Structures are given as structure tokens and as C-alpha cells.
Swiss-Prot record:
Pathway: Metabolic intermediate biosynthesis; chorismate biosynthesis; chorismate from D-erythrose 4-phosphate and phosphoenolpyruvate: step 7/7. FMN binds at residues 124-126, 286, 301-305, 327. This reaction introduces a second double bond into the aromatic ring system. The keyword Lyase applies. It comes from the Bacteria. GO terms for cellular component: cytosol. Signal peptide: none annotated. NCBIfam families: aroC (TIGR00033), PRK05382.1 (NF003793). Reduced FMN (FMNH(2)). It catalyses: 5-O-(1-carboxyvinyl)-3-phosphoshikimate = chorismate + phosphate. GO terms for biological process: amino acid biosynthetic process; aromatic amino acid family biosynthetic process; chorismate biosynthetic process. It comes from Synechocystis sp. (strain ATCC 27184 / PCC 6803 / Kazusa). This is Chorismate synthase. HAMAP family: Chorismate_synth (MF_00300).
Length: 362
């Protein structure tokens, strides 16, 4: 249970970190969309391990294979199956974790729920599960771009107390990808890289915030009450590994304002369309998109698996210690950026198809 996401554009991810591979089944993709493995690979390369000195040294090419649902470069409207094979698993690094639980990891809770767990690489709780999401997100991005020129750009906003100044209305993918930490503020990026280097040497980890901007989203996406657009985005983001917080629009800072200060006043643009002069609502009002940029921030905790010795317990009821072996990110933020973009794209694409089905039929 809990392995499927979406309503009309629906994905199911599968696989474990040290199994034969990981992947995704995509159901509900419109037919005749031109798509190639190379297009999907672009985002998978942004997510893959071993890409820089501040990410896990695990070396995986993460080459995607499209097994079904695409013929002669176009989608068929049938389920699309995408597989990425695991090539560089070192399961022996996890032998100690077969018995000992990693503090703040999913080891103990998975075993409490199922009575069994795959301790090799964390199994299903590993961030390698997100490969399927990123692959599906690449397809969703293309649908959104072709429909309304929708553009999704995520970037590292902060790491610990180092916070970047970024204009979410104008930031580009090229600026985000200009450095290994994926922060478009070059001065802050250098400080972030230095901080990650520091904790890596200390066998520790750190967290931070990814900000995501969705531009050119049409008005009308989202459903009243339980399927509000920001509610679905929150669920999507909080389903990612290591997430601990979600903020939309003005977020918690909005609680410091009065209604007259916070309200986004309307005006008519040159084309006679209503717009808002400010965007404290974050592009969504009443759970429905208003045509302004959709802005959100996601907090990621420090990576749970660290090399420092910590107190823990074993699954045979003993108090013990653990200094985790294996290869792990000292900071998940740089590789979380394409994951955030993918989940945003999946939500927007699903709501776009729902909007078309309900409101564009007559």
C-alpha cells in the first residue's frame, strides 16, 4: 500500500536500493506525446549519485530503459514502464544494520509495521525509490510545457543558516545548474559547499530548504476542499525522503501580517485579465490556481545515516551503538532539487488532466 500517487496521471514506483533495479509504471499519460529515453535521462542525471564531491560516492549511471507504452518515439496511451538497474550496490556495508537500527531512519518503524525489512541499503526507504518519480516527472514536465508553457524551477534556498537571495520569478535552470550545490546565488553557493565539505569530514550531515517556483500555470487547477492544489502539493513534497516541513506562499511569515497587509489586491492587465499585484497567496486561492507563480518551500532534515557513533538498540532487544558504514549524502539538498521538481510536475499534470476532464468537456 502507499506506492501509487495521482488520480488521472497515476504513477506506481517499485524496487529497492540494493535489489535488481528500481522504476515506475505510469498510467494515464495522454497518447501521441513525443518522448525519448534521452529526455528522461536529463533529470535522472541531475538526481543520480556520485555526481560531485558533496554527494554520495556511490557510482550509478542510472540509465533508464523504457519497457512499454512508447512506440516509435510516441506514447501510446497505455501504461509506460521505466526501469533503472542497480549496478553499484555494496550490501556488505550494511551487515551491522541487519540487527542495529539507525537513529531517525526508517529501519525500526518498517520492522515495527511489517515484522520484516530489507536492511540492505534501506530497501524501499532509500532515496533510490525517487528514481521512478523523477522519470515520471520528466514526462509530466513535457506535457505541462506543451500545454501552457508551464515551467518548474527548484533550487537550494538555504543550508543550515546560510540563506540565498533568489528571485523566484526570474531564476533559470541554467543558474541553478551553474554549481554543484544547485543554489543560484553564487556567493551563498560557495559557503554552502564549504559547509557540506566540513560536515563530511566530521562524518556528520546537515539539512536545509529547497524552494520551488511553478510559472505559467493556468488559472483553475485544483479542487475544492480535500483536493486543494496546495494540499496535494504538500502531500507530494512530504512524501519525499527526509522532508520535515512544507511552506506555501507567505507561509509562516504571513502570520505576522494583518489582512490588509497580506491580501493580494487585484488589477486588470493590458489584456483585460485579472491579476494580483502581490503574490503572498503563492499562486493559489481557495485551493485553485490563480495564474500567478506557485511558490513553495520544503524543509529537508540532515541525512540520518552518518559515520559518527550513536546510541541505538538492536532488534534483539539490546542497547548498543552504531557508526554507520556505507556511502551516503552528507546533505540531500543538491540531489533533492530534481525530486521536488518531479513531484510538482506530477501534481500539476494530474490536476491539468482533471481540469480538462471536468471543465473543458462542453
Amino acid at each position: 500500500m502507499g506506492n501509487t500517487f495521482g488520480s488521472l496521471f497515476r504513477i506506481t514506483t517499485f524496487g529497492e536500493s540494493h535489489g535488481g533495479g528500481v522504476g515506475v509504471i505510469i498510467d494515464g499519460c495522454p497518447p501521441r506525446l513525443e518522448i525519448s529515453p534521452e529526455e528522461i535521462q536529463v533529470d535522472l542525471d541531475r538526481r543520480r549519485p556520485g555526481q560531485s564531491k558533496i554527494t554520495t560516492p556511490r557510482k550509478e549511471a542510472d540509465q533508464c530503459e523504457i519497457l512499454s507504452g512508447v512506440f516509435e518515439g510516441k506514447t501510446l496511451g497505455t501504461p509506460i514502464a521505466i526501469l533503472v538497474r542497480n549496478k553499484d550496490a555494496r550490501s556488505q556495508d550494511y551487515n551491522e544494520m541487519a540487527v542495529k537500527y539507525r537513529p531517525s531512519h526508517a529501519d525500526a518503524t518498517y520492522e515495527a509495521k511489517y515484522g520484516i525489512r530489507n536492511w540492505q541499503g534501506g530497501g524501499r526507504s532509500s532515496a533510490r525509490e525517487t528514481i521512478g518519480r523523477v522519470a515520471a516527472g520528466a514526462i509530466a514536465k513535457k506535457i505541462l510545457a506543451q500545454f501552457n508553457g508551464v515551467e518548474i524551477v527548484a533550487y537550494v534556498k538555504s543550508i543550515q543558516d546560510i540563506e540565498a537571495t533568489v528571485d523566484s520569478n526570474t531564476v533559470t535552470l541554467e543558474q541553478v545548474e551553474s554549481n554543484i550545490v544547485r543554489c543560484p546565488d553564487e556567493e551563498c553557493a560557495e559557503k554552502m559547499i564549504e559547509r557540506i565539505d566540513q560536515v563530511l569530514r566530521q562524518k556528520d550531515s546537515i539539512g536545509g530548504v529547497v524552494e520551488c517556483a511553478i510559472r505559467n500555470a493556468p488559472k483553475g487547477l485544483g479542487e475544492p476542499v480535500f483536493d486543494k492544489l496546495e494540499a496535494d502539493l504538500a502531500k507530494a513534497m512530504m512524501s519525499l525522503p527526509a522532508t520535515k516541513g512544507f511552506e506555501f506562499g507567505s507561509g509562516f511569515a504571513g502570520t505576522l501580517l494583518t489582512g490588509s497587509q497580506h491580501n493580494d489586491e487585484y488589477y486588470l492587465d493590458e489584456a483585460g485579465e485579472w491579476r494580483t499585484r502581490t503574490n503572498r497567496s503563492g499562486g493559489v486561492q481557495g485551493g485553485i490556481s490563480n495564474g500567478e507563480p506557485i511558490i513553495m518551500r520544503i524543509a529537508f532534515k540532515p541525512t540520518a545515516t552518518i559515520g559518527q557513533e550513536q546510541k541505538t538498540v538492536s532488534n534483539i532487544g539490546e542497547e548498543t551503538t552504531l557508526a554507520a558504514k556505507g556511502r551516503h549524502d552528507p546533505c540531500v539538498l543538491p540531489r533533492a532539487v530534481p525530486m521536488v521538481e518531479a513531484m510538482a510536475a506530477l501534481v500539476l499534470c494530474d490536476h491539468l488532466l482533471r481540469f480538462q476532464a471536468q471543465c473543458k468537456t462542453l
